[in-house]
């Protein structure tokens, strides 16, 4: 994603790899995107986003008679704010998992040949294939990216946040993992969260400021799942905690998140599951 020509004078604090992965996922196409031309005060809320083959942030929009591009209809580079919002995996939770925010410059592709050179994948590629030349596709250049998640705020420079799609875990595998996690009994999810809190399984816990009266009556719910681990919302004694449970084998070339999740369930310590 492009890419400041100079590095910042003061290096940014390091960020946990799982948060880096979350920011990458959102920018690669997860969640919903809003693109605002902040000088004109206009916002595209029906755009889709993803990345090019070389890791640049791409947005696409289909103008129509009811929702034209307005201030976005310009061949000149446009100053924009991009917001990507991602809800919790369990949609019964009134909780947003994370959001990514950036200021940058949007430049629309001039023709279909320039779009083809981007090497698009995912939802943006599907939209271009389905709608054809009516789709406006643009590339967003930025220097810094802000991530808001359950751990707080993290700031990334683009050169530390590679977005190329090469080497990604198969999306069907991750969809199956999400289904498996959502299909796991809340009591079992609670056992996993408690095992992390007791130091019996690898992971991290972060207290949350959430009104537990607004949450479902469940000891634990799924906030997120990816190749690195599963993030759970644990509610106990009127307090809520986000617990990231690391998946065994994450980072290995033969890593299967779905199989790792099953191994993790088998590894729940007996003293947690059967006190």
Regions found by a protein language model. Give the residues of each.
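Short, surface-exposed beta-edge/turn micro-motifs
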Residues: 30-33, 54-56, 77-79, 134-137, ...
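C-terminal edge-of-domain segments
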Residues: 1-3, 120-275
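N-terminal short leaders/motifs
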Residues: 1-12, 50, 84-97, 167-183
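Coil-to-beta-strand transition motifs
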Residues: 43, 54-57, 97-99, 227, ...
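Short hydrophobic-aromatic micro-motifs
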Residues: 57-61, 102, 107, 138-140, ...
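An N-terminal domain-cap segment
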Residues: 2-73
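A generic structural motif
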Residues: 36-40, 85, 233-235
């Amino acid at each position: 994603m492009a890419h400041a020509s100079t590095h910042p004078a003061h290096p940014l604090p390091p960020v946990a790899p799982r948060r880096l992965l979350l920011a990458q996922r959102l920018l690669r196409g997860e969640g919903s995107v809003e693109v605002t031309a902040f000088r004109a005060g206009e916002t595209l809320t029906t755009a889709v986003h993803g990345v090019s083959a070389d890791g640049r942030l791409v947005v696409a929009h289909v103008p129509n008679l009811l929702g034209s591009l307005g201030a976005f209809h310009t061949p000149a580079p446009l100053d924009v704010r991009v917001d990507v919002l991602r809800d919790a995996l369990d949609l019964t939770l009134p909780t947003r998992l994370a959001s990514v925010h950036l200021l940058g410059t949007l430049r629309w592709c001039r023709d279909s040949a320039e779009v083809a050179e981007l090497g698009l994948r995912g939802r943006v590629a599907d939209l271009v294939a389905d709608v054809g030349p009516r789709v406006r596709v643009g590339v967003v250049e930025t220097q810094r990216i802000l991530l808001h998640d359950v751990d707080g705020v993290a700031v990334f420079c683009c050169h530390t946040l590679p977005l190329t799609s090469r080497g990604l875990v198969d999306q069907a595998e991750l969809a199956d993992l999400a289904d498996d996690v959502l299909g796991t009994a809340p009591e079992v999810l609670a056992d996993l969260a408690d095992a992390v809190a007791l130091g019996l399984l690898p992971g991290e816990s972060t207290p949350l400021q959430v009104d537990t009266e607004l949450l479902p009556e469940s000891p634990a719910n799924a906030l997120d799942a990816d190749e690195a681990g599963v993030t759970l919302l644990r509610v106990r004694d009127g307090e809520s905690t986000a617990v990231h449970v690391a998946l065994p084998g994450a980072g290995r070339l033969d890593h299967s998140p779905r199989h790792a999740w099953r191994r993790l369930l088998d590894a729940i310590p007996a003293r947690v599951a059967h006190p």
